[in-house]
UniProtKB/Swiss-Prot annotation:
Source species taxonomy: Bacteria, Thermotogati, Deinococcota, Deinococci, Deinococcales
Protein name: CinA-like protein
Pfam families: CinA, CinA_KH, MoCF_biosynth
InterPro entries assigned to the protein according to its UniProt record, in alphabetical order: CinA, CinA-like_C, CinA_C, CinA_KH, Competence-induced_CinA, MoaB/Mog-like_dom_sf, MoaB/Mog_dom
Source species: Deinococcus deserti (strain DSM 17065 / CIP 109153 / LMG 22923 / VCD115)
Alphabetical list of SMART domains matching this protein: MoCF_biosynth (SM00852)
Family as reported in the entry's similarity comment: Belongs to the CinA family.
Alphabetical list of SUPFAM superfamilies matching this protein: CinA-like, Molybdenum cofactor biosynthesis proteins
Amino acid sequence: MLLAEIISVGTELLFGEIVDSNAAFLARELGARGLTLHRKTVLGDNLERVTQAIGLALSRADLVILGGGLGPTDDDLTREAIAAALNETPTEDPGLISWLEGLYTSRGRVMPQINRKQAWLIPSAEALPNPVGTAPGWYVRTAGNKVIVALPGPPREMQTMWREEVLPRLPLPTRALHATTLHTQGIGESQLAELLGELTRQANPSVATYARKTGVDVRVAASADTPEAARELAAPVLDQVRQTLARWLWGEDTDTLAGAVTRALDSRTLGVIEAGSAGALCTLLADEPTFLDAAVTQDHRRLITLGLTPVTLHAQGLVSEQAARELAAGAREHLGAEVGLAVVTAVQGERAGQAYVALDTGNAQHTAALNWPGNAEQIRERAAVLALALAQRSLTRQEVLA
């Protein structure tokens, strides 16, 4: 079993100023190729701490991947840290210097002297070409038969180099991995785990649960000598999980909840009216071909022109089931869609956390409600997901699970 660790380097990552999307990408990539990731570390731009982290990682793992810290400035210290951890001395590589100078010349510029450190190499390192940036990576084979990979921080550069330069060099496991992720909605992770029972405690195939914004995911994975054998090993457990969770399932693997709604619409167009959710629902639907039109507003006068009646507004308020029903019907009538979906949400005041969603198909209406206090972003996200879940389950004639 090949063990891997990820070390993300950057004070901006440590303080949360930038989300570490690189580590998430690498974790998925490692898992898909049968490598076992057992630790992720985030460190600021500190030479001593990064050096120590590399040494510790090498004592535990076969593969250590560092992201970030390959720029030209004084606080870009990944090269120095790897060299210190391996007790090697970096020197300028003439070929890399020539490549960097040519890169700047092609852009009509002269290479700043500060960029010369990006041409450093240590004896055990091989330079990884960077086709979209100025920071070459490192591929290091240690005396202890371990591998260190250093990649730049910008995601576009890192992902390109990982696929084109790192993967062909990695000693990947010979055993094959087959994994399927099932998406559920309307059931909590603890209840789901109880239903799965002993399945979550077996090793191969393994069954694991993950809470996400759109519900709870269940990953079934098996490893074997061949892809076919791994698929066959996973199949009976996967079927059992599907049967156990059938009433909550909406998709698998790369499916999105918005995509599931599109499939359920079956070529019918969808109109959306949002009040209080700041376009959160429209953002999720933006790339879907059946998404016809939308209105995002909290202005009462505008909402009245879209179907909200003054009687409902004054008697029950904007954040009410009846208001959602009227606006869902209004999405059909005023936006010219075949199906209308509306969400009304309160993100502040006494009713903060309350939301109502409604779906109007022309033949029937369906509603669901939410009461989940949190910050404004969380409330809007939950309301948008609830609206999609309502649409998917109603259009496929499933029980609505708010």
